[in-house]
Each structure stands twice: as structure tokens, then as C-alpha cells.
Amino acid sequence: MTITLQQLIALSPLLIVGLTVVVVMLCIAWRRNHFVNATMTVIGLNIALLSLYFVGQVGPTDVTPLLRVDGFSMFYTGLVLLASLATSTFAYPWLQGYPDNRDEFYLLVLIAALGGILLSSANHLASLFIGIELLSLPLFGLVGYAFRLKRSLEASIKYMLLSAAASSFLLFGMALIYAESGDMSFASLGKSLSDHQIHEPLLLAGLGMMIVGLGFKLSLVPFQLWTPDVYQGAPAPVSTFLATAGKIAVFGAVMRLFLYAPVADSESVRIVLSIIAFASIMFGNVMAVSQTNIKRLLGYSSIAHLGYLLVALIAVQSHQLALETVGVYLVGYLFSSLGAFGVVSLMSSPYRGPDADSLFSYRGLFWHKPILSAVMTVMMLSLAGIPMTLGFFGKFYVLAVGVNAELWWLTGAVVLGSAIGLYYYLRVMVSLFLNAPQVLQRDTPNNWALTAGGVVVLISSIVVLFFGLYPQPLISLVQLVQPMM
């Protein structure tokens, strides 16, 4: 098997991030310097983002049976790289006050990004599994990075044990599917499924187990119990990564699997997925209503958002629109989450023990940091799906797909869930404009808008507003990124 230059260029984002991992590792071994390592990380991720332009020039290619690089994988790779960049940027000021080793943080983020890029191009069950593991393993370390805090350590252990259990389900499911169909690439799975083998008990059992494993990674009900605890325990920059890159990469891979292998055509699988979507939307929104901790609230809301996305996934076989929906929704979700978690990270930096994550810390933020609270307001509006923000178009598309595919139950659930969601997002927004407490527990420095993290947060809010008012460029982009069939 010789690899041509074309294939090397197609793999360039993966190779560049891998090279950055090695460089950062050598830098840490040679001399610890927080600034140097952070800069190396950001430069590496930026070069990887720029290399996507050259990947686009090459056109769709298959690199070994495991990876397929096309517009679809480039889109998801770009989203993962943006999320990793934002995470590194938020982490720098947070780590400034951190008493232990700081540099390994960037190393772990880079390795997780590597897993995300691999998942975006996965075309085979083996690369799907390797990608998920590469993404999950560094996250155990990242979630427990503030290990002197009991909560962070607890979150890390919870996540590790549950993740291991979920991975074993996933692997066993893959083994059963392989036993039945004799091949592990997505396309040949599609062939064996289209020959009406889907009623074979082994295939159904394998699919069921894979749904358990993937449902855990996407924190869908009933595999969601870790989500709020881990989001709350993890440092704010890590919660950013978990909520964005961790979900988007896995969803991209699952999306491709469903496109090539018409899994949702089977009545039983579709019913199971519909129940999961319905439960996720309802549970996520209802549980978020009573939260007083902003990271837990965003954790529950991410369960609901993945429920909305699952509606589009169920309809993916029958409708071209579903691909577009997922693209638009994920971009909106990415920037809204980056902004919301970014504000939490800015408030929590530098490290001073627990994060500023109680809603009380944000009370009256408007009176001394008006722009920061405006950013937070925009993010909450976008997550709630209010018109003139990007989140609205995502919701609108999901409803359109649901109606087109005649998923009436789920469309009703999306509407109801959005209504409940409005209540708790408004709660966060209202608390920003109440009277400020006399003694400020946590606050950002006055020049926050000039720091790198502040710039990321401001750019996110501008993107959300710009595409909310004028979504055409984004829609055209998403229509271009169709997977190679």
C-alpha cells in the first residue's frame, strides 16, 4: 500500500496536529515554558485550519479503507479545530493561576483534537472506534485537571468508569455486526443492510449495543447521567471542549454511518431512536429549569440540543435537507456554546479554586461589565433559538425536517422543548441585569475584551448575530459539504 502525495495532502490536518503533539511534547521535556507551549499549540491548530484550503483543492479522496476525506469531513474537521483553538485560548489565562504543571493541558487538548479529526473522516468501524478512544482518553485527564478540587477528581473518575463501560458496549456491538456482515466499512455495511438482513438477531443486537456506546458519547437519555456532573466538575475551558468538539466529532461520524448504512430504515431502530430523541429533549429541558449552577444548566441543555439533532439524523435517509440541517445547527451550537462557556472561563480565570459557575456570580454583571453581559445574552438567545440569532435557523431547519419526514411526535417535542428552554435561558439573562451584590465574588479584569479569550468570545457573538441576520453564506457553505457517496 503506497500513499500518494494527494493522499498525504488530504491527511494534512491530521498530520499537522500530530506533529504539533510531538513538538509540544519535546518542548515540555526540554524546558517548561507555559507561554511557549501555548503559542506552539495555537500555531499548530491554526496551520491545520489553513491546510483545509489545500485539502479542498485535492478533491474527495479515500486514504486507505479507513478514512475518506471529502467536503463533509473537512467541515467537521474545521469545527473540531475551531473548538480546540477556543479551548486552548480560554485555558491560557485560567492556567496562569494554576499551581501544578500547566503544559500538559495543551498536549491533552491536541491529542483529543487528533481523535476528533480522525472521527470526522472515519469511513470504517475500526477508525470510528480509534477516533472515539483518541478523543475520550485525553478527556479523562482534562476533566480531572484541577485534581486538588474534590469535584474535579470525582467528575474525572465518573467519566472514566462510564466511558470504559460505554466503549466496551460499542466494541461488542461492532464485533456482532462484523460477525453477521463480514465487513466493517460503512459502505459495505450499507450493502449488507440493504439486502434486508436488518432483521437478523445478531445485527440488531450489534446495532443496539453500538447505539448504547454512541448514546453515551453524545450524552443522550438514558446514557446522560454523567453529563451535568462532569460539566460541573471539569475546569471551565474543558467543559467548553466537552460540549463542542467532543460532541460534534462523534455526531459527524454517526451521521456518515447513517448515510452509508441505512440503519434508520429499519422500523425497530427508528422507534428506538425516536424514543431516545423525545426523552432527551424533554429530560434535558425539564431538568435544566431547576439548576442554579450555570455549567450544570448548560450540561442539561446540551442533552436537549443533541435530542434536536437526533431528529434530523432519523430523517437523514429520506431527505437531503437533513444534512443541511445538521450543518447549520452544529455551527450555531458550536459558536453559542463557545461564547457561553467562554464567558464562564473568563469569569473563572485565573485559577482560584472552584470556577465561577453559580448563577449568583453573574448577578448584576451588566452594571460593571456591560459588553460581557451583552455577549452572554446573545449566546443565551441563540441557544434558546430566538430569531435574529444563528440558533433560530438551526431550530427552524430541525422543525422543517421533522415536518417533511412526518415525525409529528418529535416535531411537537422540539416545539415544547424550545418553549421550556426559553424559561431557563431567560433566567440566566435576567440575573445579569439584576442589582449587583455589594461584594463581588468573582470578576473579570477590566481589559477582558483585549485578551485572547475575550476576542474569541466577541468573535463568537458577532458570528452568531451576523449569520442570524444573514444566513445565506453559511447555508451555501453547508450545501457544498456533501459526503462522497
UniProtKB/Swiss-Prot annotation:
Query: How does this protein sit in the membrane?
Result: Multi-pass membrane protein
A cellular component term (GO) from this record?
plasma membrane
Provide the E.C. number(s) assigned to this enzyme: 7.1.1.-
Q: Which InterPro entries match?
A: NADH-Q_OxRdtase_suN/2, ND/Mrp_TM
- Quick one: where is this thing mainly located? membrane
Q: Which GO terms describe its biological process?
A: ATP synthesis coupled electron transport
Q: Which Pfam families match?
A: Proton_antipo_M (PF00361)
UniProt GO MF annotations: NADH dehydrogenase (ubiquinone) activity; NADH:ubiquinone reductase (non-electrogenic) activity; quinone binding
Catalysed reactions, semicolon-separated: a quinone + NADH + 5 H(+)(in) = a quinol + NAD(+) + 4 H(+)(out)
Q: Transmembrane stretches, by residue range?
A: 8-28, 35-55, 75-95, 105-125, 127-147, 159-179, 203-223, 235-255, 271-291, 297-317, 326-346, 374-394, 407-426, 449-469
UniProt keyword annotations, A-Z: Cell inner membrane, Cell membrane, Membrane, NAD, Quinone, Translocase, Transmembrane, Transmembrane helix, Transport, Ubiquinone
Disulfide cysteine pairs (residue numbers): none
Q: Where in the cell is it found?
A: Cell inner membrane
> Can you tell me which family this protein belongs to?
Belongs to the complex I subunit 2 family.
Under the subunit heading, UniProt states: NDH-1 is composed of 13 different subunits. Subunits NuoA, H, J, K, L, M, N constitute the membrane sector of the complex.
- What does it do? NDH-1 shuttles electrons from NADH, via FMN and iron-sulfur (Fe-S) centers, to quinones in the respiratory chain. The immediate electron acceptor for the enzyme in this species is believed to be ubiquinone. Couples the redox reaction to proton translocation (for every two electrons transferred, four hydrogen ions are translocated across the cytoplasmic membrane), and thus conserves the redox energy in a proton gradient.
HAMAP family to which the protein is assigned, alphabetical: NDH1_NuoN_1 (MF_00445)
Name it.
Answer: NADH-quinone oxidoreductase subunit N
Q: Which organism is it from?
A: Pectobacterium atrosepticum (strain SCRI 1043 / ATCC BAA-672) (Erwinia carotovora subsp. atroseptica)
